[in-house]
Amino acid sequence: MSKKVMSVVILAAGKGTRMCSNLPKVLHLLAGKPMVQHVINTANQLDCTRIHLVYGHGGALLKEKLNNEKLNWILQEEQWGTGHALQKAIPYFSEDENILVLYGDVPLIEVDTLNRLLLAKPHGGISLLTARVDNPRGYGRIIRKNDDISGIVECKEATEIQKKINEINTGIMAINSSDLKKWLKQLKNDNHQNEFYLTDIIKMAYQENRKIIGIQPAHLNEIEGINDGLQLARLERLFQKQQAEKLLLSGVRILDPARFDLRGQLICGSDVVIDTNVIIEGEVTLGDRVQIRTGCLLKNCRIGDDSQINAYTVIEGSFLDKNCVVGPFARLRPGSELSEKVHVGNFVEIKKSSLGQGSKAGHLSYLGDAEIGSGVNIGAGTITCNYDGVNKHKTQIGDYVFVGSHTQFIAPVTVGDHATIGAGTTVTLNVPENELGLSRVKQKNIQGWKRPKKT
């Protein structure tokens, strides 16, 4: 293809009735992102000047979910076929530019395949992505004469002989805008669906002796569309398998690729081990020799070298330095920072707090809006009472503080270095360094007391 300005058109106006959902089809999630987002991301990797999105059902929600994208939004109020969708885009095409047609429900198309398609486009002709499949049911068939592509017949219009053809149309094509405009204006809807088929322009091109080149995808799953929940689930597993295989080949040890979900971007150091049923969301970085045990959810976090995340731990928006141990059943909420060799045990929740080097919170604690120094021991059942019903307040604990079990810090409050907090204390006043803070009620023993008996 000669070097010309190129625009991408993504068709995404379908209602997706077979999804049995009020959500627009192209907003259903694949690997944590709307399926149309995958197509947009792919288009953004091409040498294109503009991306047009033809939308219809659920337009307001589409714009809300894709508000960060630089798109030209084109409304198709009535869905009268793929040809009709492209007709709506005609006013936005520049003269003599190349147009690449993509589909919002075909999310796994690869950049390399599209680049091959664009390079193969002949001058004055069309390059068309086709595929040979074992079961062509539901797809339009490629019609050839003397091995040249002469047309496409939609499945519902095909004869019994044509239905035996196993070369299918994917709908993805590259075409010059001037030719596309001309042929779109000639489309008719005299077919079983009363729709304007984009595929009819292939016959028009052939009748004008234009060259039509068929290109095959590198992998068949690239051209699979999503029309129902079953197809979505199938492509989800295919995509997750692909991602797991790439990580395995890079040296990451994933114990069971079939039970691994990556819904974002994962960067791993060497000798990382990921157990079963781990979910990665957003941008996650794992250092060297990190171990992630079964059932963990990691989202937008960084975990330092030689750290271990034990089973069923949730970490979001947090930073962990080297040699940390977290979990099982722990939760690190956004804004949490753990320095080297910090231990956070089972049923500990940390929110917007920092723990200094070597500090430990072993079990059953809530630490919110806290700044905790190095070498601190947090006893079981410790709570920072950070909320007064209106505002959040901070708890500051110095280095080498010992906090006894079942302690409550009524923030704002400060505890100095090397202080000790007795078990069961409610801390309402600042505790100076090296002092013992204690608010325990004096114990009283009642002699001769007997338990009541059942009557």
Swiss-Prot record:
Q: How does it assemble?
A: Homotrimer.
Reactions that this protein is recorded to catalyse: alpha-D-glucosamine 1-phosphate + acetyl-CoA = N-acetyl-alpha-D-glucosamine 1-phosphate + CoA + H(+); N-acetyl-alpha-D-glucosamine 1-phosphate + UTP + H(+) = UDP-N-acetyl-alpha-D-glucosamine + diphosphate
Q: What is the lineage of its organism?
A: Bacteria, Pseudomonadati, Pseudomonadota, Gammaproteobacteria, Enterobacterales
For binding acetyl-CoA, which residues are annotated in this chain's numbering? A380, N386, Y387, S405, A423, R440
Task: From the Swiss-Prot or TrEMBL record, give the protein name.
Answer: Bifunctional protein GlmU
Q: Where is this region: N-acetyltransferase?
A: 251-455
Q: Region Pyrophosphorylase: start and end of each range?
A: 1-229
Q: How is the cofactor bound?
A: Binds 1 Mg(2+) ion per subunit.
Q: Which family does it belong to?
A: In the N-terminal section; belongs to the N-acetylglucosamine-1-phosphate uridyltransferase family.
Write out the ranges of the annotated region (Linker). Answer: 230-250
Q: Which gene encodes it?
A: glmU
Catalytic site positions:
H363 (proton acceptor)
Q: Which UniProt keywords apply?
A: Acyltransferase, Cell shape, Cell wall biogenesis/degradation, Cytoplasm, Magnesium, Metal-binding, Multifunctional enzyme, Nucleotidyltransferase, Peptidoglycan synthesis, Repeat, Transferase
Task: Quote the InterPro entries the UniProt record gives.
Answer: Bifunctional_GlmU, GlmU-like, GlmU_C_LbH, Hexapep, MobA-like_NTP_Trfase, Nucleotide-diphossugar_trans, Trimer_LpxA-like_sf
